[in-house]
Amino acid sequence: MLEAVALTSGWLLIGMTAVTCFDVLARKTGIPAPLTKLQELEWHFHAALFSLWMGYGYTINANPRVDSFTENMTFRGKAWVELVGCLFFALPYCALVAYHSLDFVASSYALAEQSDSTVGLRFRWLIKGIYAAGLWLVVLGILSVLARVIVFLFGGRSEEEVNLQIGHTEAEV
């Protein structure tokens, strides 16, 4: 599911590219139209892309890591660090923030929040909803990695069988 969401949302890149190129060309050629909506749409596209890719990115180990602590550990040792990190840090934090993000979106919707600019985009709750959805996708990504770590550590399966990727090798750096 995470992969499908990420790959589908990847099409937003085309929209973001088109809007950004038009915005730049309009400014360089001196088109006197108010471009506030386009400029806001640029960051909406960027925020949506980032938010909808975060969960999947974690499952494929595309997230930035500081591996100085685990670089000399065995893969099993790295899996234990990942287990502790998921259970005690990543999952509680992300779940808490994701849970409270729902109030953030509901409040924005109830207030009919819109851009501070008079010619900006309306429906600010929509992008806030995408932020919230992205946080819940991160929670799902953490649960996915956590399940694979548990199966690897306690289920007797190899890292290839559970498609577990933890840390970076020297070749990847």
What are these regions (language model features)?
Residues 1-173:
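Alpha-helical transmembrane segments and membrane-interface helix-loop junctions
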